[in-house]
Amino acid sequence: MNITQAYKRSLWWSMDMVGATGSVERKMLTAVGLQFLAAGGMAFLTVFTAGTVQLIGVGGMLALSVVAFYNTYLIAEADFVEPLVALEDAADDIAAGEFERADIPSSKRDDEIASLVASFDGMQSNLEVASRQADALARQAFDDPALDESVPGAFGESITEMADSLEAYTAELEDKTAELEHQQAELERQSEQLRALVDALSEATDAARAGDLTATVDAAALDVTDDHRAAVEDFNQLLETLADTISDIQSFSDAVLAVSRTTDERVDAVADRSAAVSESVTEIADGANQQTNQLNNIAAEMDTVSATVEEIAASANDVAKTAQAAADRGEDGRGEVEETIEALRALREQSQAVAETVESLAAEVERIDGITALIEDIAEETNMLALNASIEAARTGSDGDGFAVVADEVKDLAEETREQAADISEIVDAVTEKAEDASIAIGEVDAEVERKITKAEGVLRDFEAIVDEVANVNHAVQEISDATDQGAQSVTDVVGMVEEVASVSEETAAESDTVADNAAEQTDATDEVADQMDELAEQTAALAGMLDDFTVPADAGTADQSVADDSPTAQPPAADDEPAAAVVDQPQPASDAEDEEGVPDSGGESVAVSDGGWADDRSSFTWADSQ
């Protein structure tokens, strides 16, 4: 044990003796009290002692101050710095998630710092337990002993609830897993059933493709569901329907063969009759064409006459339009002349009004001139009075100075008034001269306006005469235009009638040609129909040979056949279980090509069946389910 540790022990023993270790506050007060006591002692010695005693006392107080400072340092380091630094390190470890590495220092004291350390240690323990529980939940180790440990507060309750929820969820997942395994086994069983069903359907389909329509699928021998059993029954029903249809087609092909032979004979008779009709219609068409040519010539001549009349009518219309335009222009010119006369008359009235205004102005100027003369007379008399007043003022001497001044002012005013009156007189003379000039000019304007009015009235009379003459010309031209229009309309009506007759003749010729062509085409068509009926007979025989390759049940196609003798289309009655209707399209022109089996090309002939249709195209059968 060194001196420092011994001193620390003695220091804390002494603080225990005085009861200062139980509180940080008392520790600090004790250290500060010692320093204050040393400072107070030094002050006391400085005031009340002197000499050697003072020096010894001050030295002792200084040593006491050093001891008090050192004690304060030891207390702060041991009770404050070291515990707080340790708590900081532990908090850093906890913040980093290292709960087990957090080392909380123990404290043997019972002050506030010791209480803080104890609380922090409890928090670290709870966090460590929570960490172990979270790890156990993550590993789904619900029997881990850590889950039995309790964590106080709401956080511990949350951990417990989370553990219970996870355990329940895990149990539910186990149940779902077992259910999925059961469903997987069921799916595997159904897959085996479907595989067996597909194999059976494949064998039956191969047999049907080979022509054996008696090969069906035994649904009772297969372990399948009701839906799959219904599909098997539909497939078997489909084969039965196909067998019935093929049997009906076999019967139908025999009927078609008989009908084709009868039709061939009738077609030959129709061909002979069509040839005779074609010759007669050709003769009618030739006569209609000749008549049409003659009518077309007449119509051409009438078109020429109509064009000439229309040109005359157009020329007359142009002349009428020109005359009407001239009349309109004459009317417009007369209106403009009348407007000009009215404007000149208004100008004359305005100039007369201006002349009257100028004369009134001259009269007023003369009045101003009289007033100006009166002002000059008054100014002259005022000047004379001022002169007399000056003479009287001079005669009275010094007593008349004031009167003399007034006389001078009056004299000056009279002089100024006379000068202004002279200026006004000059202005009045100038205004009078201008007014006289304006009056002369206005008189000249009135004379000129009067001449213009007289001339415009003469022009107006000329315009009225022109308008009357143009109106007469326009009326005459209009009568000519109306007459030519009527003539043109008459010619047009005649041309229309001729053209209508020619059109009827052309239509008759065209229809005759059409009838002749149709008769020829009918003859060709009957020949072609005869050829096609022969080909149909050959194809029907080939179809019967191909149908013989199919194996059908003995009771298939038991329905009777009904064939019309005069129609190439036959509809055999349907079977009892599935209604079926066969329609044979009109045969197309046959080709000379044959397929590999030596069967003539059908040329596009097809036989359609409404339920489960099949088609014969170039001697090959293709199954097409018509749904």
UniProtKB/Swiss-Prot annotation:
Methylated by CheR. Residues 505-527, 557-627 are annotated as: Disordered. Residues 266-502 form the Methyl-accepting transducer domain. The chain crosses the membrane at residues 28-48, 55-75. The modification Glutamate methyl ester (Glu) is found at E310, E416, E507. The keyword Plastid does not apply. Residues 580-590 have a biased composition (Low complexity). CDD domains: HAMP (cd06225). SUPFAM superfamilies: HAMP domain-like (SSF158472), Methyl-accepting chemotaxis protein (MCP) signaling domain (SSF58104). It is a multi-pass membrane protein. It is found in: Cell membrane. Disruption phenotype: Deletion abolishes bacteriorhodopsin- and halorhodopsin-dependent phototaxis. Mediates bacteriorhodopsin- and halorhodopsin-dependent photoresponses by detecting membrane potential changes. Probably transduces the signal to the histidine kinase CheA. Interacts with CheA, CheY and CheW1. This is Transducer protein MpcT. It comes from Halobacterium salinarum (strain ATCC 29341 / DSM 671 / R1). The lineage of its organism: Archaea, Methanobacteriati, Methanobacteriota, Stenosarchaea group, Halobacteria. The gene is mpcT.
